Each structure stands twice: as C-alpha cells, then as structure tokens.
Amino acid sequence: MDKLIKTISVSGAFRAYVLDCTETVRAAQERHHTLSSSTVALGRTLIANQILAANQKGDSKVTVKVIGDSSFGHIISVADTKGHVKGYIQNPGVDIKKTATGEVLVGPFMGQGHFVTITDYGTGNPYTSTTPLITGEIGEDLAYYLTESEQTPSAVGLNVLLDQEDKVKVAGGFMLQVLPEASDEEISRYEKRIQEMPAISSLLASENHIDALLAAIYGKEPYKRLAEEQLSFQCDCSRERFASALMSLPKADLLTMLNEDKGAEIVCQFCGTKYQFDQADLEVLINDKT
C-alpha cells in the first residue's frame, strides 16, 4: 500500500514528507498505457500533487497542471485530502532515449512552460497560482512554487524508476520545508545535508526507501513521525456524471448521436474508463430535456 509519512524535527524547525507512490504510478501507467518518458513525467506530477494535497485540510482538492511546449503536451492531475489522486498526460507515447545508467530524462525535453496549481476549498472560489517551469524536472519546479508562491523555503526530490521492460519499479520522493522557528545554524546544517544527499534515484533504489529518505533528510537530527496516510490512484468519475454532461448538450447534438451514431461512448480522460450510452439511454436523456 502506498503511503505518505509526515514528520517534524524535534526542534520544530523543519518538517518533511516522504512518500512511496509505486502502486499509484503503476496504476496510472496501466490505465493510460504510457511509454517510458511519459510514465516518468506523469508519475512525478502525481507525486507532486499528492504532496500539495497533503498540506490541505477538510475536503479541499488540488489540481496540478504542468503546461509545457514539449512533445509531452499538458500533464493534469487532481488530488484530495484523503490520499486519492488521478491524472493524465496529453501524449502518453513519449519514449526518449535513456542515459547510459538507464535514467529516463524528463527535464531537458519539457520545454518552456508553467507549473499551475488550483486549490479548491469547496467554497466556490478556487485559488490559482502559476510559476514558471524552472527545470522541467517537476520536483525542482514544485520546490520553486512552494518557495515563491507559498513563501515556504522547500527542497523536493521526486522520481519514478522503471525496470528493464519499462514498467514501474518504484516511485516516490520527499519534501523538506523550513519553518519559522529555524535558526541560521540549523538551516545551514540541513542545506549542507541536502546538497550532499545521494541522488533521489539511488535512495528510491534502496531496499527500504522510506527509511533511506528519512535518514538522508535528518541525518542524526532527532525527529518525530506525526502521521501516516494511505495513497492511491482513484478516479471519481461515474456514469451519472457523464450522463449529466450529455444532458448539458443541445438537444440537436443528442439527436445526432441517437440517429446517426446509434449511441455514444465517453472515455474518462483521467482514468480511461469507458461509458457506453445506447440508443435507449439517449432517448431517455432527450425525453428528460423536453
């Protein structure tokens, strides 16, 4: 089971989230049939989204849009405070040559663009924030967003490792944030540790990458585990929701589907689930509109 662990230093000056999102990203790959580079780009976005949602309370939802001018197209994901996330990539078929070590490159091919977040607090007035893509690596772009937009200095590491068949082997990451109580001396110690931290791919490849991430973040500094939350890829689409969407169409369009197409098929962008509406279903919808 995927999980996110919330921790805080005993001094109260730093907080860190560490995540195992392997099954979440694996589910996304299976649903969207993504090739290597698209899998990693989408996976990193899902992980980033789960970090942002974990910072919220109540029934809030956070949408992340990675909008670049590359062959990936847009990457969109939505996460809630219950650990659920869904998402898709506009072009699932990007398969860029890997490095000599088998690393899948994303940043150099993301292009120019923006990291957009939309936080819906359930009040009808969502808050939107946009920052430029700094590297296109997603993790560094999230760190820049947190530091610039939320005014919380942050370090973020995210990655998705693939096996020899380009299937998801492990996915996860971390976020470390400086809190107002931090002294200059503490900040210097943590900065040095983050700078000397092994590559995120190496930490994720560890036998127990959650413990490896925590050890890399805190070193010998004492910390407390505050909470452990379960994570999963879960879409909230439904036949009823898409029926309502059809009902919003002009009657003429529904008649065209009925008489010419003999039905309608709707595919959820976020999870790939297909919903069939036959002629009888469309007749009911048309009658309900009159």
Swiss-Prot record:
Gene3D superfamilies: Hsp33 domain (3.55.30.10), HSP33 redox switch-like (3.90.1280.10). Its main location: cytoplasm. This is 33 kDa chaperonin. It comes from Streptococcus equi subsp. zooepidemicus (strain MGCS10565). Keywords: Chaperone, Cytoplasm, Disulfide bond, Redox-active center, Stress response, Zinc. Pfam families: HSP33 (PF01430). GO terms for biological process: protein refolding. The keyword Zinc applies. Under oxidizing conditions two disulfide bonds are formed involving the reactive cysteines. Under reducing conditions zinc is bound to the reactive cysteines and the protein is inactive. It is found in: Cytoplasm. Disulfide bonds join 235-237, 268-271. Belongs to the HSP33 family.
